[in-house]
Amino acid sequence: MARDAELARSSGWPWRWLPALLLLQLLRWRCALCALPFTSSRHPGFADLLSEQQLLEVQDLTLSLLQGGGLGPLSLLPPDLPDLEPECRELLMDFANSSAELTACMVRSARPVRLCQTCYPLFQQVAIKMDNISRNIGNTSEGPRCGGSLLTADRMQIVLMVSEFFNSTWQEANCANCLTNNGEDLSNNTEDFLSLFNKTLACFEHNLQGHTYSLLPPKNYSEVCRNCKEAYKNLSLLYSQMQKLNGLENKAEPETHLCIDVEDAMNITRKLWSRTFNCSVTCSDTVSVVAVSVFILFLPVVFYLSSFLHSEQKKRKLILPKRLKSSTSFANIQENAT
């Protein structure tokens, strides 16, 4: 058997070089054609080499040779070189489909920002697909090493570039602050805030229904300010609590923000409340500060006034001179005698 195989290889070696020789000759023809000066579609000397139809056939044959097809077993290149292994191709297509879905979700959720609450399942899916590619490095030496061929086979490293873009966007939006620890669902605080946010917007819309048929925008939003005051205060209070909780959990990073969905929702509500509706809510902290300031201002007055009223008032005693005493006593004696 070994001898037969050796004979087959020795007898078939010229056929392996036939495509190379043919391709070399075709390239020489093309170089000769390119070197010819021409000013029109039919230039002198062109018919001596190849006609236009033959030139097209040469181009098609050259392309077929370069792609490894069209000649069957006589192909220059291995048939599997331009394409990936089936397993690697499947992993790449899974990542491509997941990336396309996540990209579409991110763009649709750009304004108003609903990135974290809408796209977190798709982000988890992309992370899983990327992890599958990274882990698939081939169990044996003969197995497909998809991680290397898909991630680091070229200078561009497009798969890694796309994955890093998603990760950096997710970190910039701080979506982890809106999700649970495993990132599979929204946190309780986020759900409560979004519920209050929707109720506040519904209150705004309900109290504006009477002005929808007016051609000019209304200038008086007293109904909105009066009826939605409690909802707005509850939303602001919950947002402040979430900020304090986030500050306690991230003492090492004092500038850590809440997730972009919560921040954008609160910014929208504040703009509607203060700029559009021109509503104002008296802050309880301001009242307390003013009261304490007035008390401290009048404290010295109260202190001096109370000390003056409750201090012991000593009566002044006049000391008469001796001469005055003797004269007064003598006058008294004369009065008694008369």
Curated annotation (Swiss-Prot):
Changes after translation: Undergoes proteolytic cleavage in the luminal domain, the cleaved fragments might be linked by disulfide bonds with the remnant of the protein. Highly N-glycosylated.
Keyword annotations of the record: Glycoprotein, Lysosome, Membrane, Phosphoprotein, Signal, Transmembrane, Transmembrane helix
The keyword Lyase belongs to this UniProt entry's keyword annotation: no
Residues annotated as transmembrane: 289-309
Species in which this protein is naturally found: Mus musculus
Expression (tissue specificity): Expressed primarily in osteoclasts and melanocytes as well as brain, kidney and spleen. Found at lower levels in the thymus, testis, heart and liver.
InterPro entries: Osteopetrosis-assoc_TM_1
UniProt signal peptide: 1-34
Places the protein is found: Lysosome membrane
Positions on the Lumenal side per record topology: 35-288
Protein's name in the database: Osteopetrosis-associated transmembrane protein 1
Top-rank lineage group of the source organism: Eukaryota
Disease the record associates with this protein: Defects in Ostm1 are the cause of the spontaneous gray-lethal (gl) mutant, which is responsible for a coat color defect and for the development of the most severe autosomal recessive form of osteopetrosis. Osteopetrosis is a rare genetic disease characterized by abnormally dense bone, due to defective resorption of immature bone. The disorder occurs in two forms: a severe autosomal recessive form occurring in utero, infancy, or childhood, and a benign autosomal dominant form occurring in adolescence or adulthood.
Biological processes annotated in GO: osteoclast differentiation; transepithelial chloride transport
Modified residues annotated as Phosphoserine in this record: 326, 329
The encoding gene: Ostm1
GO annotations of cellular component type: chloride channel complex; cytosol; lysosomal membrane
Topology of this chain in the membrane: Single-pass type I membrane protein
Subunit annotation: Chloride channel 7 are heteromers of alpha (CLCN7) and beta (OSTM1) subunits.
